[in-house]
Amino acid sequence: NTIPLQECAEKGIVVFNTPGGNANAVKELFLFGISMAGRDILGAMKWVYEYDGSEGPIAKRMEKIKKQFAGPEYAGKTIGVVGTGNVGSLVANIALNLGMKVYAYDPYLSVDAAWKVSRRVFRVATLDDLLKHVDYLSLHCPLTDETRGMIGEKQIAMMKNGARVINYARGEVVDEDAMIAALESGKIARFVSDFPTEKMVKAPNAVLTPHLGGTTGEAEANCAKMAAVQMDDYLKNGNIRNSVNFPDVTLERAGSARICLIHRNIPGMLTNIMPVFSRDGINIENMTNKSSGEFA
């Protein structure tokens, strides 16, 4: 979220990302997250490290106080997964293997992503349909104008009392003030997020990590390889794959020369461009044009 995408597009700079490169790393972090969302493991760990021995040996004292950190098992519970792309599809499938009933919501589901999700996952048509069913909610959607603040006061009110929310999407997908209020009231039993803020660290029952989703050696290597392949294809062939500010566009290499043009997505642009080639006696053997928003 730190790159000025619009400014880059205005200057013809293609910005790539590497979707799926860290998907397994985030899936594995989800296993930590759902465990922390259930029992108060964080509180229990704090107790262990802060215990000063004033009430006797730790081995005896812990047996008397451990029930205060108890929580539910996730086997047999219902989880809702919002976003079933590279990460969400893995999370949905592993939740099934944990013995959970899984609902999924993704209005932008691609055909490729659909094949990755088990048939045992229940798909719902709206977010509201998902929220009313779940004991756990796991977020794995991109941050867009539509998803910003997607989980707010209204959506939280639809959920079961004592539901648990895991956010490995983007921090802004959740309305922070609404979530803090829900934690304070007990409406949400626990909130696990990889996106800490100064306000959220003070909230009760919030378990926060410093954006650890892709922090494995394997994930970093995967992303680096994907980025190198995508950049090489763009520089050599003009193909754009996995850009966040331009549409995906690919064309098999046929001739010895290739021209990649970035232009405004307005009527008449191609009509103005084509005569330049005709004037210089250049034949266009094949071409493709894709647009997205203001640019093509």
Say what each PLM segment does.
Residues V82-G85:
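Glycine-rich Rossmann-fold phosphate-binding loop(s) that bind the pyrophosphate
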Residues G88-S89:
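N-terminal Rossmann-fold NAD(P) dinucleotide-binding loop
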Residues P19-T78, N242:
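Phosphate-binding beta-alpha-beta segment of Rossmann-like dinucleotide-binding domains, i.e.
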Residues K27-K46, N93-M100, K225-N239, M274-P275, ...:
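Oxidoreductase and adenylate-handling cofactor-binding alpha/beta cores
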Residues G12-N24, A169, H211-G213:
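Short beta->alpha connector loops at strand-helix junctions that form conserved
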Residues F191, V201-P204, L212-A296:
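NAD(P)-dependent dehydrogenase/reductase Rossmann-like domain
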Residues N1-T18, K132, G152-K154, M158, ...:
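An N-terminal-biased, well-structured beta-alpha scaffold segment characteristic
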Residues P107-M200, T215:
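Rossmann-like adenosine-cofactor binding region
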